[in-house]
Amino acid sequence: MHCLPIFVILLLLTASGPSVDAQLKTKDDVPLSSFRDHAKSTLRRLQDKQTCCGYRMCVPCG
């Protein structure tokens, strides 16, 4: 019973928190999604057999 008031207060605080829909941005106001897209395309390029044949982090050529 001692935890019930604390639980109610925490529930009210989390309900009034910021929305999850907010888009993450850097300090320069560039969306972080563009950085994620760049990282994904770089990884895709590195995993291409023709571009990374012989590197340890890539799939061996075959």
UniProtKB/Swiss-Prot annotation:
Name the source's superkingdom.
Answer: Eukaryota
Keyword annotations of the record? Acetylcholine receptor inhibiting toxin, Amidation, Disulfide bond, Hydroxylation, Neurotoxin, Postsynaptic neurotoxin, Secreted, Signal, Toxin
Report the GO molecular function annotations.
acetylcholine receptor inhibitor activity; toxin activity
Q: Which residues carry this modification: Cysteine amide?
A: 61
Tissue-by-tissue expression: Expressed by the venom duct.
Residues annotated as carrying 4-hydroxyproline in the record are 60
Signal peptide location = 1-22
A GO CC annotation recorded here is: host cell postsynaptic membrane
One Pfam family recorded for the sequence: Chi-conotoxin
UniProt keyword annotation of Hydrolase present: no
Localization (cell): Secreted
| Residue numbers covered by the propeptide annotation in the UniProt entry | 23-47
Q: Which cysteines are joined by disulfide bonds?
A: 52-58, 53-61
**Entry's InterPro entries?**
T-conotoxin
Concerning its family, UniProt says: Belongs to the conotoxin A superfamily.
- What's the domain remark here? The cysteine framework is I (CC-C-C). Alpha4/2 pattern.
State the name under which the record lists this protein: Conotoxin TxIC
Source organism of the structure: Conus textile
Its ancestry begins with:
Eukaryota, Metazoa, Spiralia, Lophotrochozoa, Mollusca
